[in-house]
């Protein structure tokens, strides 16, 4: 069952994300360091009438990597063609996409770390020298065809930058690290979304939503919609701080943005293993979740908020986790 705090896109959220997507850097809320850098790089490329260097965007899900790719295309005034690593299964799939590019176009590859190595290798010459050599036919009848490509910009997005090969990573001239959002930026995003969807919300309610959104706009917007539902049925349709607290309590989202699964992880470590260290496999069995799910979906936020530490001997619940859940802390 999907969690309301999942970073991945749910249901019809792809349409919602497009509706809310800013078009230009001046409209993009948050990620100030990345925006400042890109504003300079984009303007320099435009003045030289050149394609922008290839861009790698990396960071946790839901932080606006896809949105930033579209913003870059709009700022440059060029077309963007979109695909994903898993969708490009064969080298021929990528060649077909590259062959359709016009001068200056952007090719956006989401989840680029999941692209097969045989496909990735086609990108090397395409990115560096704007050509590809492909083999057609088989056996004695096979031959190589050289295809020149127009200058283009590849934007790759990944949640797992460490999984990129060194040759691919080295071909990106620009990198953008998308970080978790600050409370003030998320509050502004909640208020902007409320305005677009004509939802009535006061500032304190928006701030409370932002505090519990795990630093992620996608989660903030999802929680806003669920609190709106609660306000319409239980209240008078206006989202107040009190309504927000009651709705999020009903949804099992606490003041730190932890849900019942996050709390279950920490409680299991504290109650059964004296806070740890606990091996990932042992922890996964105890909470009935897959190892990868625990490592990729739950742990990053718990670590970022200081509730959990990864050590060489296993996972350890911090003093902050004890305090947050109301357990006495014993420093052994």
Curated annotation (Swiss-Prot):
Signal sequence region: none
One GO BP annotation of this record: DNA recombination
Enzyme category, top tier: hydrolase
Subcellular location: Cytoplasm
Binding site for Mg(2+): 66
Keyword Calcium set for record: no
Amino acids binding ATP: 20-21, 62, 65-67, 128-130, 171, 181, 218
Domain comment quoted from the record: Has 3 domains, the large (RuvB-L) and small ATPase (RuvB-S) domains and the C-terminal head (RuvB-H) domain. The head domain binds DNA, while the ATPase domains jointly bind ATP, ADP or are empty depending on the state of the subunit in the translocation cycle. During a single DNA translocation step the structure of each domain remains the same, but their relative positions change.
Function noted in UniProt: The RuvA-RuvB-RuvC complex processes Holliday junction (HJ) DNA during genetic recombination and DNA repair, while the RuvA-RuvB complex plays an important role in the rescue of blocked DNA replication forks via replication fork reversal (RFR). RuvA specifically binds to HJ cruciform DNA, conferring on it an open structure. The RuvB hexamer acts as an ATP-dependent pump, pulling dsDNA into and through the RuvAB complex. RuvB forms 2 homohexamers on either side of HJ DNA bound by 1 or 2 RuvA tetramers; 4 subunits per hexamer contact DNA at a time.
Protein family according to the UniProt entry: Belongs to the RuvB family.
Summary of subunit composition and partner proteins: Homohexamer. Forms an RuvA(8)-RuvB(12)-Holliday junction (HJ) complex. HJ DNA is sandwiched between 2 RuvA tetramers; dsDNA enters through RuvA and exits via RuvB. An RuvB hexamer assembles on each DNA strand where it exits the tetramer. Each RuvB hexamer is contacted by two RuvA subunits (via domain III) on 2 adjacent RuvB subunits; this complex drives branch migration. In the full resolvosome a probable DNA-RuvA(4)-RuvB(12)-RuvC(2) complex forms which resolves the HJ.
Protein's recorded name: Holliday junction branch migration complex subunit RuvB
Organism (species): Streptococcus pyogenes serotype M12 (strain MGAS2096)
Gene name of this polypeptide: ruvB
